[in-house]
């Protein structure tokens, strides 16, 4: 198991008691690894895919607990050399799905709208945690430190940089083919867990 997967598994165990923080984390997860599903009569749904089973379970719990969805779940073997499993959750197109996307500040046409759930520092931490869980990687602190998050949305990448700057994290952004990469090489730790007894720190996040 890679160091990144170890960190993601640890983050996926963190319990968030505040719904606003759960929603902020879910929003970033969907923006990072989600896509729209179209239906008839202007109905919309969504699809979320990840290679981490703990992250998939976390998204499933959030969708069921906070928004009343019962997503279908699929597991398939990846096509790459290691053939890692890919876990996919699907919320079928419906009026409820469209209402959910509007509530989350996600516009099916524009792709990314201004985030309505980033008022407190805890919500911002949860948002960054979601972005990392959805599309981040990190090297071991003992080696040359490097944290990066990859997205296909320029606006989302810019928002990640802005949110990281709130915590005085000097993140930078670059583009690679069709992706935008937010990265940081200088070590800095920001607590992302609300649990006082168990507060794992991700260097740079």
Predicted features and spans:
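DNA-contacting interfaces and partner/effector-binding or oligomerization modules
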Residues: 50, 56-57, 61-81, 88-205
């Amino acid at each position: 198991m890679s160091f990144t997967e170890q960190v993601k598994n640890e983050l996926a165990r963190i319990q968030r008691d505040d719904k606003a923080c759960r929603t902020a984390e879910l929003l970033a997860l969907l923006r990072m690894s989600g896509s729209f599903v179209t239906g008839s009569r202007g109905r919309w749904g969504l699809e979320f895919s990840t290679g981490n089973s703990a992250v998939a379970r976390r998204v499933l719990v959030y969708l069921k607990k906070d928004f009343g969805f019962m997503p279908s779940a699929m597991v398939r073997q990846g096509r790459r050399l290691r053939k890692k499993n890919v876990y996919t959750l699907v919320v079928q197109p419906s009026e409820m799905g469209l209402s959910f996307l509007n509530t989350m500040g996600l516009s099916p046409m524009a792709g990314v709208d201004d985030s309505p759930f980033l008022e407190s520092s805890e919500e911002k931490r949860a948002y960054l945690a979601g972005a990392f869980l959805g599309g981040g990687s990190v090297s071991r602190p003992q080696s040359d430190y490097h944290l990066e998050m990859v997205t296909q949305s320029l606006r989302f990448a810019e928002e990640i940089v802005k949110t990281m700057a709130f915590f005085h994290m000097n993140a930078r952004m670059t583009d690679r083919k069709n992706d935008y990469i937010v990265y940081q090489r200088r070590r800095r730790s920001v607590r992302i867990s609300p649990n006082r007894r168990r507060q794992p720190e991700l260097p740079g996040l």
